[in-house]
């Protein structure tokens, strides 16, 4: 269990948001319905979990509507409450897909592949049985989706189970995602399917081991129950298996939790369900700050009002969010659905849907095929997060004056993002001794070179980790570096026109004949981008593979010379250059992951799981627990062979067919 202990230690360094279970109270004594009081199977492996459901004690919970038990899930507005009671809907023959040992270790659990453990996990983590002390509920929140206020949203497919207090003094909220309908399910069924659940399960854990603040995933349980899904929204629905993910975090409260008080929006006309309930906003703020920002609460106990406390809270949320998105940019992570309801109030990556990691570097990469306007491209993520913080600032008024919040946002976000981003990029480039003003320009030119050559984001940084600081083997290194650039076939596929030529021609004619109408339609950006694609495609058609290779080498030789010049400045005054080089390489390898959850890796695991084979999910999970591991660390012929196999299977550039993979909001 050494790896588990190490993971627990690492988690303490990454998640700064963990509230302590000080003065542990008995589980909530709130009245429980007949179904909650009914006899449940007795857990054995999970028997030691102690629940203390503070959120339900300290925040308003909706009084269940009169009627039968199944009326708990009747879709309805939920005014004057932060939670509604819920009940997981049973699944037919639940079966464990995988457990995450490091995530479950947070709860004091030792995971294993013993049949009894897997059976118990499948029973309780599917929602088919409830652990003693759990109080299932659904959280009420609103959100701005793709820039427009959508009104009440809430946990339509997720359920709060309760909060586990551990022997280490930590408190963790447990949540089942995909456990069935709630009052917030609207017209949906409250279920998630196998493909989307595997993606969330694997990416939650992958992000943690990359060192990025994130919610965790302890288990993935599938079943023989099915639901209909139209994966690509093309009129071809199919049945898919219902699956549940056990999610773990200090809290799942989000920016949108504070938007339930929003008056009717001037654009959409929608309002939050608790307009005018300033008392609940105060209650929610008090709960969040005292529970998850206790140092801020303690620093402002003598204040005559809470404005300075709330300002300090907003400042910290702003800084955490800036650092989080900076970390995303440094590993090429694209979230895909950065709505305000998908932004954690404690600065964690939350709600993994149509996410993706960059393969070929493209600043305009759209990982979510449902994002037709490209609102959430890779390069726009920092500014979208800042926009979401602006909406949080508006939601906190009058408890925090908007002018003060906006001043904090203007002062903190861009500065903190740039500081953290450049600090991380310096480590990725092995610039460990001195900081130079031109480092930002060097990074920008690196990304420009990667874009011009279609370089693989993850693998390019890995190759740079072995860059010779002297002039030895420079030709061999350049060959290895350019081998990570996209082939001519890949580029032609990537830049193929996406708009029917006749439609494009009509749009161009409209732009000439009636520019006002063309502007009103709002397709100018799309047409401009399509023209750029057509032009790029035309240039590619005139290139030969050897021409492309020569251009790539020229681009990289130019940047590598600047990089070498910067390294020369880095080692000025160094006495032991060998020790400096060794430390530089060590830092680079510790900050440039070899393995990320590429879409094609996830897809292969999903396809195997859909055929009843969960071994690939478990294999990928173990691989992602050591993303910075390199084959140089392997010892012995068997270990080296295994490492080499993993290298070729999981760290190569994606196959050509991976470019056709399409991920949407369908889940």
From Swiss-Prot:
Modified residues (Phosphothreonine): 635
Subcellular location: Mitochondrion
Start and end residues of each stretch annotated as Disordered: 628-652
This protein's record includes keyword Metal-binding: yes
Origin: domain of life: Eukaryota
Phosphoserine PTM positions: 651
Enzyme Commission code: 2.7.7.-, 2.7.7.108
Molecular functions per Gene Ontology: AMPylase activity; ATP binding; metal ion binding
Keywords, in A-Z order: ATP-binding, Magnesium, Metal-binding, Mitochondrion, Nucleotide-binding, Nucleotidyltransferase, Phosphoprotein, Selenocysteine, Transferase, Transit peptide
Co-factor(s): Mg(2+)
Presequence extent in this chain: 1-6
Binding of ATP, residues: 154, 156, 177, 189-190, 247, 254, 351
Keyword ATP-binding part of the UniProt annotation: yes
Record: residues binding Mg(2+): 342, 351
Catalytic activity: L-tyrosyl-[protein] + ATP = O-(5'-adenylyl)-L-tyrosyl-[protein] + diphosphate; L-threonyl-[protein] + ATP = 3-O-(5'-adenylyl)-L-threonyl-[protein] + diphosphate; L-seryl-[protein] + ATP = 3-O-(5'-adenylyl)-L-seryl-[protein] + diphosphate
Database matches in Pfam families: SelO
Principal location: mitochondrion
PANTHER family per UniProt: PROTEIN ADENYLYLTRANSFERASE SELO, MITOCHONDRIAL, SELENOPROTEIN O
Designated name of the protein: Protein adenylyltransferase SelO, mitochondrial
Primary gene name: Selenoo
């Amino acid at each position: 269990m050494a790896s588990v202990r190490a993971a627990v230690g690492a988690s303490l360094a990454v998640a700064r948001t963990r509230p302590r279970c000080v003065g542990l109270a008995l589980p909530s004594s709130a009245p429980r319905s007949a179904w909650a009081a009914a006899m449940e199977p007795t857990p054995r492996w999970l028997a030691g979990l102690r629940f203390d459901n503070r959120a339900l004690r300290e925040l308003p919970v909706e009084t269940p509507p009169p009627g039968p038990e199944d009326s708990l899930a009747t879709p309805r507005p939920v005014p004057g409450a932060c939670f509604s009671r819920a009940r997981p809907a049973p699944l037919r023959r639940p079966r464990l897909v995988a457990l995450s040992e490091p995530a479950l270790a947070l709860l004091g659990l030792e995971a294993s592949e013993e049949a009894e453990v897997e059976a118990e996990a499948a029973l309780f983590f599917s929602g088919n049985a409830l652990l003693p002390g759990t109080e299932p509920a659904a959280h009420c929140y609103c959100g701005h989706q793709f820039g427009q206020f959508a009104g009440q949203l809430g946990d339509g497919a997720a359920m709060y189970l309760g909060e586990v207090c551990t022997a280490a003094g930590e408190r963790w909220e447990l949540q089942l995602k995909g456990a069935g309908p709630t009052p917030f399910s609207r017209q949906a069924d409250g279920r998630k399917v196998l493909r989307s659940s595997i993606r969330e399960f694997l990416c939650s854990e992958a992000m943690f081991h990359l060192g990025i603040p994130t919610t965790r995933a302890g288990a993935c349980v599938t079943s023989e129950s099915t639901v209909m899904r139209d994966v690509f929204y093309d009129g071809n629905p199919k049945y898919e298996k219902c699956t549940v993910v056990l999610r773990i975090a200090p809290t799942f409260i989000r920016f949108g939790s504070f938007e339930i008080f929003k008056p009717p929006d001037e654009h959409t006309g929608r309002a939050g369900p608790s307009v005018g309930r300033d008392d609940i906003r105060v209650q929610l703020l008090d709960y969040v700050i005292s529970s998850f920002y206790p140092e801020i609460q303690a620093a402002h106990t003598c204040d005559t009002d809470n404005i300075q406390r709330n300002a300090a809270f907003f400042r910290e949320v702003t800084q955490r969010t800036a650092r989080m998105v900076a970390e995303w940019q440094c590993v090429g992570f694209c979230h895909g659905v950065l709505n305000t309801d998908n932004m954690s109030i404690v600065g964690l990556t939350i709600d993994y849907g149509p996410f993706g990691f960059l393969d070929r570097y493209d600043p305009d990469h759209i990982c979510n095929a449902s994002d037709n306007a490209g609102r959430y491209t890779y390069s726009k993520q920092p500014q979208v997060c800042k926009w979401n913080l602006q909406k949080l600032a508006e939601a906190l008024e009058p408890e925090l004056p908007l002018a003060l919040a906006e001043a904090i946002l203007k002062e903190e976000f861009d500065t903190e993002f740039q500081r953290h981003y450049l600090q991380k990029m310096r480590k990725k480039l092995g610039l460990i001794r001195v900081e130079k003003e031109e480092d930002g320009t060097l990074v920008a030119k690196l990304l420009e070179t990667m874009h011009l050559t279609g370089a693989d984001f993850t693998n390019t940084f890995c190759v740079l980790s072995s860059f010779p600081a002297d002039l030895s083997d420079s030709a061999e290194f350049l060959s290895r570096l350019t081998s990570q650039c996209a082939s001519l076939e890949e580029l032609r596929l990537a830049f193929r026109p996406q708009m029917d030529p006749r439609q494009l021609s009509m749009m161009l004619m409209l732009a000439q004949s009636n520019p006002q109408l063309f502007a009103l339609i709002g397709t100018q950006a799309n047409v401009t981008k399509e023209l750029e694609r057509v032009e790029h495609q035309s240039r590619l058609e005139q290139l030969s593979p050897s021409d492309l290779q020569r251009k790539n080498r020229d681009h990289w030789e130019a940047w590598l010379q600047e990089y070498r010049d910067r390294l020369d400045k880095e080692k000025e005054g160094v006495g032991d250059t060998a020790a400096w080089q060794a430390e530089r390489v060590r830092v680079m390898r510790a900050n440039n992951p070899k393995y990320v959850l590429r879409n094609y890796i996830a897809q292969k695991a999903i396809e195997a799981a859909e055929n009843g084979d969960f071994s690939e999910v478990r294999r990928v999970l173990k691989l992602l627990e050591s993303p910075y591991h390199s084959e140089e660390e392997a010892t012995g012929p068997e270990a080296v062979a295994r490492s080499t196999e993993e290298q070729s299977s999981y760290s190569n550039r994606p196959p050509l067919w991976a470019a056709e993979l399409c991920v949407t909001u369908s889940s």
